């Protein structure tokens, strides 16, 4: 199985013979800012080493800033990495997610054999998560994935709705 997250500029160029503006990943069409280029140059002497896989220094600084134990902080190589780690750690049996939504959720969940329950967002609701989403959260659902803002629709779920979703998850034992 081959999972493609996005940002496949080489595939697009090979298929169409030209470059495209790609908004499928957090890639800037403007190139690297000078500050980032300078940081890369400063980091070159350490480029022959893998970074600390446990991110000890980063977790320590975040813990101090946030007033939390470092053990409560998980760092990863982007959101997709963290989503896969969550799926591998929790191994849920059944998950609820809005559709369409960020493809990494379903990819990660399918990797661990999780059954997917998709709540189809309606064009008539401007593809927003509505009260009907709550009806799909029941005791058979172990985990609910909600993207904020939703990807690819760009819709924000208002705080009151997020709070209702959290309450419903708590009632049903879902995370």
Task: List the predicted regions and their residue ranges.
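Glycine/Thr-rich phosphate-binding loops of Rossmann-like dinucleotide-binding domains
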Residues: 31-33, 83-84, 105-106, 153-154
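N-terminal "arm"/small-domain region of PLP-dependent enzymes with the aminotransferase-like
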Residues: 1-49, 146
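PLP-dependent aminotransferase-like
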Residues: 88-146
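Short active-site oxyanion
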Residues: 46-49, 71-72, 92-95
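Active-site phosphate-binding strand-loop segment of PLP-dependent enzymes
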Residues: 123-175
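Short loop-beta-helix segment that forms the pyridoxal 5′-phosphate
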Residues: 51, 63-85
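Short, well-ordered alpha-helices that flank and scaffold nucleotide-derived cofactor binding pockets
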Residues: 38, 42, 64, 84, ...
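Short glycine-rich anion-binding loops that position phosphate/pyrophosphate groups of nucleotides
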Residues: 26-29, 79-80, 102, 148-153
């Amino acid at each position: 199985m081959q999972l493609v997250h996005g940002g496949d500029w080489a595939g697009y160029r090979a298929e169409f013979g030209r470059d495209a503006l790609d908004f499928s990943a957090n890639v800037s069409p403007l190139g690297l800012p000078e500050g980032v280029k300078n940081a890369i140059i400063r980091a070159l002497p350490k480029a022959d080493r893998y970074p600390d896989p446990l991110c000890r220094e980063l977790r320590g600084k975040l813990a101090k800033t946030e007033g939390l134990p470092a053990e409560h902080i998980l760092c990863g190589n982007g959101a997709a990495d963290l989503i896969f780690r969550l799926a591998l750690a929790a191994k849920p049996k059944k998950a609820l997610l809005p559709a369409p939504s960020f493809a990494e959720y379903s990819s990660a969940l399918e990797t661990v054999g999780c059954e997917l329950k998709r709540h189809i967002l309606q064009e008539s609701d401007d593809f927003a998560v509505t009260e009907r989403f709550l009806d799909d959260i029941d005791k058979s659902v172990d985990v609910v994935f909600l993207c904020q803002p939703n990807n690819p629709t760009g819709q924000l779920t208002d705080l009151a709705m997020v709070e209702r979703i959290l309450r419903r998850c708590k009632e049903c034992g879902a995370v």
